[in-house]
């Protein structure tokens, strides 16, 4: 929230008993260099909106408070009601109070006018996370039959400045629904993700657009490219699962084999990458980790040169799945699982040593014959 803005005052003083002297004339402004002229032009452009005629930025020196505008004289502002005994009351700036007092007034009146529409822009500039303002703006967009493409340009600029704001992404989604035109979306989202590839607001919007408008083509190639750039990006692994689950699925043996081998290759590049291990477990666990042909042998082959806590924990899961499915050499498999739990507790994942010892005790109590369980367990 903006802080309260103080207003400084100054007075010219002279010597005691002497008449006040007029201030000296101001020096002439220095000639603007080309760069300064360009900056001044940009500042002038920023003060006016390409969407709302007559809109002035709140930072403009010519901005006038709503209470001082003749065209708003018919409105009684509605102050915020914090109750009789507010605790830790927010100190709003004068502009903030003024804008939102008038916004509450037009909201109560359900005033669907051009001036109310312009007011929402000021309110959004002060707090773009206020969902009530966005909702009322959408009501006005429909009632005033505004150009939705202009509104798309407006929301694009705001998202570029505030890419992690729930309300701005929801507003964009509604506009895309109204326009029934996703043609700008994937490129726009890719641009946002190029700045922060883990922005879950952008990923959520991308998934909605792809699913709503059936834009599955080339998405897996896009995911491949992002994983080449950052194989640790859990958001991209999640997108890979989303795309395949909604297209080919994993029931096709060829697809599953491709994904298993793809993931193992990514693991070889970065063995300590938990995201890849989670993906591998996610695509196999419904069918049973121990039932995938040759997976155990491939993991054991990785262990000497690519060992990590995640590999060992995955092996524990595989052995547990084998025990659950009544394997022939149950005692041997149990001992291997218990040995790995101890390695994790003592060497590879000591911060969670008590967890791994708990897993070991649970495996013993579930899969040991009662007479075989050590007295200390």
UniProtKB/Swiss-Prot annotation:
PROSITE patterns in the record: PFTA
PFTA repeats by residue range: 112-146, 147-181, 182-214, 215-249, 255-289
Modification sites for N-acetylalanine: 2
Reaction equations catalysed: L-cysteinyl-[protein] + (2E,6E)-farnesyl diphosphate = S-(2E,6E)-farnesyl-L-cysteinyl-[protein] + diphosphate; geranylgeranyl diphosphate + L-cysteinyl-[protein] = S-geranylgeranyl-L-cysteinyl-[protein] + diphosphate
Record note on what altering residue 164 to A does: Inhibits prenylation activity. In myoblasts, impaired insulin-induced RAC1 activation, possibly due to impaired insulin-induced geranyl-geranyltransferase activation. No effect on MUSK-binding
InterPro entries xref list: Prenyl_trans_a
UniProt keyword terms in alphabetical order: Acetylation, Magnesium, Phosphoprotein, Prenyltransferase, Repeat, Transferase
Annotated PANTHER family: PROTEIN FARNESYLTRANSFERASE ALPHA SUBUNIT/RAB GERANYLGERANYL TRANSFERASE ALPHA SUBUNIT (PTHR11129), PROTEIN FARNESYLTRANSFERASE_GERANYLGERANYLTRANSFERASE TYPE-1 SUBUNIT ALPHA (PTHR11129:SF1)
Family listed: Belongs to the protein prenyltransferase subunit alpha family.
Protein name from the UniProt record: Protein farnesyltransferase/geranylgeranyltransferase type-1 subunit alpha
Organism per entry: Mus musculus (Mouse)
Native organism taxonomy: Eukaryota, Metazoa, Chordata, Craniata, Vertebrata
